[in-house]
């Protein structure tokens, strides 16, 4: 499947769970025909229970609902929680589930990391938020800072087609859609141009990274990137410095406190390389950064699930949208500049680690390990990821009057 730019779309930026979850649950509540939901994480907490209730109500009123969860990111949903949905008719699948070894999850690589919702070919959501109370400010200091978009217009048809291509048993649905569906002539609720891009392990291995590189090459005035896990390849780093050196203002927002020590060590090498190359690096300090967004000049932006690290760029299944829209671009710029002013600390040369032989050795080793990590994973025994559907619970046998009389008389019904 290949997608092209679609015009006439309406797009809304959603920040954190306070904006995202009410919008998603409202759309599910208004669904009439079909819901497709993909996510990496679904926890059985307050947010997860609200999603459960919304999907259950939709299925009970006759809406066809399908859910795809990652087997690593969502391993602990209770049988009761899932069975209630499947009993109501929700099709519930896990992406590549694996048994635990000594209580530890073993399926850490090549994950389904996308976060997509499609409602009736009318509305779609795509971004970085999972379904967890961690995305609500009420969660406390560890609440995540994140973004998603709500989409209406022709791009939703592309996102639905993408989902139908990737879910099993959908060949008949795809054929029916192509034969019978005609886009409504005037169904262009907005002015945004939008392109769906994704990363898989087949024909689209580097599509998301390629669009980033093209953006950096074309930038003339300003680029702002906010990304939770920033550890791209040589080409990306070189493109950043090259853009900065030709006068483009580059602002890079990353986590102030990475959750893995090796990432912190490697990042210090990036700080030296980028800051001395003219890139403005900002550490977001208010709370954990989980966003994956960027903008360029006045008209280019992206929002989605893809980090800029080896896992997202080389192993995981990811999805972003690329957006050409001046109003959306300005909205995102205002938001990112706001968190830079209020919640970030700029990295300057006084904060860079001393270039001793020991610090340099540690940074170089960590950097090259992380960059070659996908290749190292490639040496592991290959397997074909599978989708495992959860069967509805068995229904108890009904004690009908005919059955009672048959058992009493010994006569076949």
Curated annotation (Swiss-Prot):
It holds the Pfam family PLDc_2. One of its GO terms (molecular function) is cardiolipin synthase activity. Its EC number is 2.7.8.-. SUPFAM superfamilies: Phospholipase D/nuclease (SSF56024). InterPro entries: Cardiolipin_synth_ClsB (IPR030872), PLD-like_dom (IPR025202), PLipase_D/transphosphatidylase (IPR001736). GO terms for biological process: cardiolipin biosynthetic process. Coiled coil: none annotated. It is found in: Cell membrane. The active site is at residues 113, 115, 120, 290, 292, 297. It is a peripheral membrane protein. The keyword Membrane applies. NCBIfam families: PRK11263.1 (NF008427). Catalyzes the phosphatidyl group transfer from one phosphatidylglycerol molecule to another to form cardiolipin (CL) (diphosphatidylglycerol) and glycerol. Belongs to the phospholipase D family. Cardiolipin synthase subfamily. ClsB sub-subfamily. This is Cardiolipin synthase B. The lineage of its organism: Bacteria, Pseudomonadati, Pseudomonadota, Gammaproteobacteria, Enterobacterales.
